[in-house]
């Protein structure tokens, strides 16, 4: 027999508070239409697996029961502007819209990391992670003074990407992996 995931009789539904403020306006005999919305959603009690139990205890994270501890925030705005008119027998309409939304992991039960950039808490949901670039190697002097790169067995040539040693330990390794670029969900 094998041991499976433990149950948790105390789990509950996730909770969400949503706020939405909108304005709609029509002008110039209803030819110009403007719609603007601002929204915010705060979610708490998100069901997640605790990442705070060290592996030294011999308990696999997959066998730990899920608990309601996650907290996220999402907010943004939407703006739609439309113009509709008629010239003779020709009817036309033009419209354009823009939306912006940014989310953030406010709290996630995760193991302590030595550097803040290694956490999910404080960053966007689905944030991409990778090595931070500081341009390209342009001179032999830059190549000679670079940190040891554990990902490439320290091979580098002129024109290769120059990565940043974020923690200053002289190595380019998994402790230098940080949030880069935009998250998986576009903001605009």
Annotate each predicted stretch with a short phrase.
Residues 1-33, 62-87, 124-129, 181-187:
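Outer-membrane beta-barrel signature, preferentially recognizing the C-terminal barrel domain
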Residues 2, 7, 43-46, 65, ...:
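Glycine-rich, flexible loop/turn motifs
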Residues 1, 51-58, 165-168:
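Short amphipathic alpha-helical segments, especially helix-boundary/capping motifs
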